[in-house]
Amino acid sequence: MSGYLRNDWRDVTCEAVRAGFGHGLVLAAREHPQVVALSGDLMESVGFGEFQKEFGEPRCIEVGVAEQNLVTVASGLAAMGAVPFAASYAAFSPGRNWEQIRTTICLNDRPVKIVGSHAGLNVGADGATHQMLEDIALMRSLPNMVVLAPGDAREAEQMAFAMARDERPNYVRLP
């Protein structure tokens, strides 16, 4: 099966996809000072804890449990030259703030990076209210939006770094 597996496949460790994404975000932020992280009071839970420890305020913004505000603030920051990564559970972003994503980010083609964490069915004790299956369909329907779904932590790490350089709106789905 030569050529089908990555050269380092034996060295891959079991790591949460969002942890890999969070590490990639830190690497991207070290090279790109305009990268900022926003969340709806979920910084640690969505994998941004390492970013928060290294950069803190003003590059780390907790907007409260207000996902509509989360993406609207991110859009405003992008309009001023920042590269915002706005994260929440996928059930709430894009689940609760789809209209704001459409209007303030996509129609204006702002380079906001939306991170939908805890996507899918495996959300533990949180149950059906936190499950999100429709996020890819919702986000693919938006103009200018790039939709990404990494397969493992290493891919997620590289994806975060690539997203920081992309000048389009992005959505990444993290399990």
Regions found by a protein language model. Name each.
Residues M1-L174:
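Thiamine diphosphate
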